[in-house]
């Protein structure tokens, strides 16, 4: 059920002004956010319906009033830099954009918990560029004012490509990640106001003094849960320690799940954050996109390839021959074998996995995105964050090591408000994860096959080295470890 403050009623003079603080504690100054008169005129019943229909919860630890969601682009605060021009290609803001924008424009720290494909990049990106433009207006020299940290190079490049469209002349935007020329990236950093980066390369550049983070006023931790899963917690702490304190910096965190580890990270880096949850409640560690129809088939391991061929013949023939299909495998050599198998059956297919060099990965993704190759076989390197338009079907040939990864895999379809389909092969070898998978299916109102229920519905207790024992609603396994199996 949507929650709202009793202070959400109309008020055309409403603005969000930070509480007075001592000079040493003050957040970076910026014009106060003033709600537009047009938004102020929207009946309260429409605001209530919007929050309820999108299952939105807003939690604010401060005494400040709850700000009305910006449900139309015409309600955005005035801007003299034509920042909003690219938004003309969209009909309206997504729920996560609508609710977080007012708080971000007001300078508040924000935590956004939302499914994949919900429009998070522009949710943090538009306020980011607006803030940097305000900072640059009062400083003639180049300075790094905003840093966006993300777990993978593919996601870093994707965010960069989206933000370029909103970046006017005078705002340098650099994308830094491993596997590319450091010299080229250093040159880009010299003129950068905004950096999109992976943790490892960002830490490298800070360690060798190629960049200065002392003037950062806007920090984004995108897919924070995934960065912790990948072991970047200490790198992130080292990077953030080089920035101004949380009282002098606006910090934004977006995450698809809300486990204890992410909550502790938020406590460490943020100051009185507003927490916005879309499509669920904070007691749920993970949730699946309800627009995705999930079909789970219990099969024998030796029957996977024949079933895969049958599904491709069903969904990739005739008028559907160019529909995008994303096929997930667990191991690199398995992905290579499946790619060859699919190609041998006459389908156009490409692959992406960790053994491929950067150029090969780019070429595969570009071919898939353009539609020239409609089938892509991937390991989990492609499962998180990549915004590949119009993926009609996700096929899980091998179940991942965690149900979190399952949710992020299937989240490659059903994006930007569209419907999607995900078909998963589940074997006896995966039965330790059956309880977690059942919870995911239940939470999204999906059919649960009897064969899956026979494996059990118990979600086991989980141990974490740092946080002890706790229960996870949708995970039955300990943290995934690297296994040499089919590699």
Swiss-Prot record:
Family of this protein: Belongs to the DEAD box helicase family. DDX5/DBP2 subfamily.
Keyword match rRNA processing: yes
Region (Disordered): 1-40
Enzyme nomenclature, EC number: 3.6.4.13
Gene that this sequence comes from: DBP3
Chain ranges of the Helicase ATP-binding domain: 101-276
Organism: Ajellomyces capsulatus (strain NAm1 / WU24)
Helicase C-terminal domain residues: 291-456
The name this protein goes by in its record: ATP-dependent RNA helicase DBP3
